[in-house]
A protein has these predicted regions:
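Short, well-ordered beta-strand elements
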Residues: 140-142, 147-156
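Active-site beta-strand/loop architecture of penicillin-binding DD-peptidases
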Residues: 126-128, 146
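Short, surface-exposed loop or secondary-structure junction motifs
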Residues: 1-124
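Residue-level detector of beta-strand structural context in well-folded domains
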Residues: 108, 128, 138-140
Length: 182
């Protein structure tokens, strides 16, 4: 896990799959990942920090454990709580930038679920979960109510939200609305 990867790490990067004419076409990692390997005046979203699946899962476990990982305190409990608390002004009603994700706000670095799924089309999940997804259809989430974390890494462009909906339905069940009492 590092910001701006050394060239020697390029062979370890997953290839990118691009949806073209209804088929997935594999793109070479060197062509798909150039912004991870050079200095940029401004790094666009989706580039810069790169990690392994294992490290990302450790990060998620640390968050679900309120800042502790393998017995070591990494972040204060209050920091994790602040990160996972909606920081948006309630006056901001337009949330079209989060299609299919339901009633969510935004914490520091995460979307935060504010109410149970209201429609069958919404992603399954629990109130208080926090998550983020990436341009290449990646997803991670932390569900404190169920003590659950998930890291779902595919490298598919353009973004495909149906993968997330189907993955969450497989984890929670298609009719899940949250733990009892939500």
């Amino acid at each position: 896990t590092a910001w701006r990867q050394p060239d020697a790490k390029l062979p370890r990067f997953a290839a990118m799959n691009v949806q073209t004419d209804g088929k997935l076409v594999q793109q070479d990692a060197a062509a798909a990942q150039p912004l991870h390997f050079r200095d940029n005046a401004l790094t666009p979203g989706g580039f810069g920090l790169a990690s392994t699946l294992d490290d990302y899962q450790r990060f998620a476990r640390m968050l679900v454990n309120k800042g502790t990982l393998d017995g070591a305190r990494i972040l204060k409990r209050s920091t994790v709580k602040l990160m996972a608390t909606d920081q948006l002004d309630p006056a901001i009603k337009e949330r079209a930038w989060l299609p299919g994700k339901g009633a969510v706000g935004f914490g520091f670095d995460f979307a935060v679920r504010k109410s149970p799924p209201q429609t069958h089309e919404e992603n399954r999940g629990a109130v208080g979960e926090f998550f983020w997804d990436g341009a290449a259809s990646t997803l991670f989430w932390v569900d404190p109510a169920n003590k659950l974390t998930a890291v779902f890494f595919v490298q598919t462009m353009p973004y495909d939200g149906t993968l997330h909906r189907d993955f969450r339905a497989a984890v929670y069940g298609p009719d899940y609305k949250g733990p009892p009492g939500d």
